[in-house]
Design a protein with these regions (language model features):
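Major-groove DNA-recognition helix of helix-turn-helix-type DNA-binding domains
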Residues: 20-48
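Extracellular beta-propeller repeat domains
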Residues: 67-68
Length: 68
């Protein structure tokens, strides 16, 4: 029986920008600072993000703002 990987949806940068309200430059700055989920390389000039990781990151930001 072949094992299958769990289904993960990949989303492109414009969708991440819509979900977060952040610019491309700010998202990449957060990634370089280790403060945002890293992208997945799809090809030599193509990347995407794991949708569940972005959703979790957003949920964490909401929880932090509610706790303050």
């Amino acid at each position: 029986m072949a094992k299958t990987a769990p289904k993960e949806n990949l989303i492109r940068l414009p969708e991440v920008q819509r979900k977060t309200g952040y610019s491309k430059a700010w998202i990449y700055k957060l990634i370089s600072n280790g403060e945002f989920p890293k992208q997945v390389r799809l090809g030599s000039r193509s990347v995407a993000f794991i949708e569940s990781e972005i959703g979790y990151w957003i949920a964490q930001r909401i929880a932090e703002s509610r706790a303050a």
